[in-house]
Amino acid sequence: FILCVTSRLITSINYIEDIDSMRFALSLFDYDILELRPHFPGYPIFCFFAKTIYLLIGSVQMTFSIIGGISTFLIIYYSNLICELIINKKSYYLSVLIFLNPLIWNLGNRYMSDLFGLSLLIIVTYFFFSSINLKNRKQLIIAFFLVGILSGVRISFLPFSIPFILYVFFQSQLNFIKSSFIMLAGVMVWMTPLVFLTGFENLYEISINHISGHFFKWGGSVITSDFSILDRLLKIIESIWADGMGGFWKGRSPLTLVLSFGWIFFIYSFLKAKNITTDNRKILINLLIASILVYFVWILLFQNVVYKPRHIIPFLPFILMLISVGLTSVISQIHFHRILIYPFIFCLFIVTTYLNWQHKSPSAICQIKSYVYDDNSIMKIFCSSSIVNSYLKKHKGSENIIFLNENNSVGIKRYYNLGYTIYSTKNLKNLNMTIKFQNNFYHNPYVNRLWSTMRIYKYNKH
């Protein structure tokens, strides 16, 4: 536990890396989902814990890293319990693989609720599996209650639990009505204060607007995306392999190629492993496969998998379980293979450490914010999309800048003629303005795929 928290504190970040992180950070100071602090559904359980920690220590970056460290510990602990339930023995390498996983570590420092949500999802999975395996009614009640809690932390992870819930409804002595009431009790834990803070009518209105927007306007679903199903599928594969496992992809370091050979060997080892589970536990494996398939279809169709690899994180602990099981099985049979694991873990450590080091440097949009705010021009106009404008507006110093939409050609040209300096993320050459500066800002897309490259143009008549 101490190692998980301390390591995440060491790699904490002290800047706002994207628009979603900004909304969660602002929720520590003034929680209001009507003002997108954070965005709907408000993540009240997560924000409550984050606010409590922030009030105790007074540091935004440390707050999210502490939660990330706690979440990492819970993921490791309950993943080992799940692994033991499935194969009836421990895999000592699983803890190391989860601890050093590049995406899990990255999200442990990000100002978001994803990793805390994943820890709850793993706990829910454990209690469902344990109740099914041991016929334990008490653990089943806990599982259903935690499903309700999970919806207040990371509602987009709920589809993963659908096969568990359906199986219990049809096979368990805990009937549909009782199960539903237990889940409702979990929901009411966070829904009651949310209604009190927001108002029922306001909450209803924003929920309808957000659900409609997510699926039909800006949420990155297959309905609104310009990318085909095949493109989305390839991005999911890239997210799992490159972002999630640190595997090789076009443009990546040769070290990730070495890491890839290791993953392939250990996956092969798993496929060759025999008698890794018993017949009476195969129902758990079948349920797990069903959950993975349901969640896969959900993100393929309805999540922004093109720009946000974090949507694949529910897959990672279970992939690492399978690999660690196969690895343990083969090493126990062929002692020589034991020496292969240490160079592999070292490569994984180097890749993850390097990404964490890069994560501590500001993202491209944060670099643009710093450039615009620190530039010595007095009268400033910043032009971009509404979402980029929103990011810059929330930072100290925005009161000295006028923000315009990048398509507002008339307004931009008018301010330019008045002597203002124009900063734009779009090339405005059609407006015949004198360009004074242009430059690209970058960050590693495997740290954060969103806005990994952004260009700024500066125009001034003088």
Regions found by a protein language model. Give the residues of each.
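Hydrophobic, aromatic-rich transmembrane alpha-helices
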Residues: 169, 241-282
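Short acidic/glycine- and proline-prone juxtamembrane loop motifs at membrane-interface regions
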Residues: 40, 103-117, 308
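Signature aromatic-anchored transmembrane alpha helix within multi-pass, membrane-resident enzymes
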Residues: 1, 92, 138-145, 184-188, ...
